[in-house]
C-alpha cells in the first residue's frame, strides 16, 4: 500500500526539470513533465485518496533560490509531502557563467530546506538526486562538480531518513538500452521518456 495518505497534499519543488513549462498563472498546473505523469498515474490508481498535487518548480533555480522562496512556495502551502529535486544548476552555472556553488554551500543550503520543513510542517520528504548524461561531450567534465553534490544529497537523505529517488544511476543504466540523448537530449533536461523514468522511480519511492 502506498505511503501517501488520504487527502494528502504533495508538493513538487525544484528547477526546470520540475517546472517543465507549467503555467505560473494557474496554481494547479503541473507542467508537462514527471510531476504531471506521477500525479496522473497516482490519481488513476488511488482515486479514493483524493490527493492534491502542487508544482512550484522554477526553471534555473539553485539551492539558494529555493531557500529564498521556501516560506512562500513551500511552508505557506502546508503540504504533507515535500519532494525536492535540485542541484544540476548548482553545477551548470560553474561551467556556463563561472558562478560555482561549493559542495559545502550546496549541502548547507539543502540542509536548511530540510530543517525548516521539519521544524514547521509535519511533512514527509522525498529527495530526488540530480543527474547528468554525457551529451554533448562537455557534460563529462561536469561529473567532478556534480558527483560530490549527489553524495551530499544521499548523505542528507540518510541523516534525515527521507525517501530517496536515485536518478543518476538509473539514467546511466537506461543509457545502456538506448543512447543517452534518447533520455535527455542535452544531458540535463529529460525527454518524455526520461520524464516517465523519473515519474516511475518517484512512485516507487512513495510505494505507489
Where are these regions (language model features)?
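Short glycine-rich His-centered loop
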Residues: 2-29
Amino acid at each position: 500500500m502506498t505511503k501517501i495518505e488520504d487527502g494528502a497534499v504533495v508538493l513538487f519543488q525544484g528547477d526546470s526539470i520540475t517546472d517543465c513549462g507549467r503555467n505560473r498563472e494557474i496554481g494547479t498546473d503541473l507542467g508537462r513533465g514527471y510531476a504531471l505523469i506521477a500525479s496522473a498515474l497516482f490519481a488513476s490508481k488511488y482515486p479514493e485518496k483524493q490527493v492534491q498535487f502542487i508544482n512550484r518548480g522554477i526553471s534555473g533555480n539553485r539551492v539558494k533560490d529555493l531557500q529564498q522562496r521556501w516560506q512562500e512556495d513551500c511552508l505557506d502551502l502546508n503540504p504533507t509531502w515535500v519532494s525536492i529535486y535540485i542541484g544540476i544548476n548548482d553545477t551548470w552555472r560553474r561551467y556556463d557563467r563561472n558562478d560555482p556553488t561549493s559542495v559545502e554551500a550546496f549541502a548547507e543550503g539543502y540542509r536548511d530546506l530540510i530543517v525548516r520543513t521539519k521544524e514547521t510542517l509535519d511533512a514527509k520528504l522525498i529527495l530526488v538526486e540530480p543527474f547528468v548524461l554525457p551529451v554533448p561531450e562537455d557534460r563529462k567534465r561536469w561529473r567532478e562538480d556534480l558527483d560530490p553534490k549527489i553524495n551530499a544529497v544521499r548523505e542528507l537523505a540518510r541523516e534525515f531518513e527521507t525517501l530517496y529517488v536515485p536518478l543518476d544511476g538509473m539514467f546511466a543504466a537506461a543509457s545502456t538500452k538506448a543512447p543517452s540523448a534518447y533520455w535527455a537530449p542535452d544531458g540535463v533536461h529529460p525527454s518524455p521518456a526520461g520524464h516517465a523514468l523519473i515519474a516511475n522511480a518517484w512512485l516507487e519511492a512513495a510505494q505507489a
